[in-house]
């Protein structure tokens, strides 16, 4: 007989949800956020690490392969996002104090790069973005990023390569394969520092 596609269970729905999810609207979770637990956020807070939260309505476009050689011709699906005044205040204050600004995932990088001003400060934003970040790209806000190990030919991998440098990211991916790291939504992640 014909095999039916597996249906998501309530347990699947719980595991594929970030702990800070509040607003309905995303088709998929911003998967890098899945690495964070309430305990980890509390430990970060105790160490004086502030967190700013934004709303991302991630779409299925993140899973489309890049099928063009000229990356400027790749069309991104639009995604809705909201960056509040409170989030801007936390991020901009950290930046002005010389602290690191760490984006959790490529969707956050896409959102913040959409909303960063020419002065390097994050601006309030409530709208849509179809920004496609690929090498070379001059980042205006974050100086570090946590990124999952994404699949080849994906826009997510291109954004990661733009942030960490293509050669260094490809070297990290080769090591990840060699050492059996997991790729994709429930896979492993890396921290990229750009000082």
Model-derived segments and their meaning:
Residues 1-195:
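Surface-exposed, charge/polar-rich loops and edge strands
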């Amino acid at each position: 007989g014909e095999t039916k596609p597996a249906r998501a269970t309530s347990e699947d729905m719980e595991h594929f949800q970030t702990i800070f999810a509040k607003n309905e609207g995303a088709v998929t979770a911003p998967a890098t956020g899945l690495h964070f637990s309430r305990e980890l956020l509390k430990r970060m807070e105790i160490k004086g690490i502030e967190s700013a939260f934004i709303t991302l309505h991630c779409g299925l476009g993140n899973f489309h392969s890049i099928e063009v050689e000229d990356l400027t011709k790749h069309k991104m699906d639009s995604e809705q996002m909201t960056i509040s005044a409170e989030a801007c205040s936390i991020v901009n204050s950290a930046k002005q104090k010389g602290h690191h600004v760490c984006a959790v995932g490529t969707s956050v990088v896409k959102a913040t790069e959409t909303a960063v001003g020419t002065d390097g400060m994050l601006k309030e934003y409530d709208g849509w973005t179809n920004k496609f970040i690929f090498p070379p790209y001059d980042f205006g806000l974050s100086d570090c990023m946590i990124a999952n190990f994404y699949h080849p030919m994906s826009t997510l991998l291109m954004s990661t390569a733009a942030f960490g440098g293509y050669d260094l990211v490809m070297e990290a991916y080769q090591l990840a394969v060699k050492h059996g790291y997991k790729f994709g939504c429930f896979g492993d992640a890396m921290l990229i520092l750009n000082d």
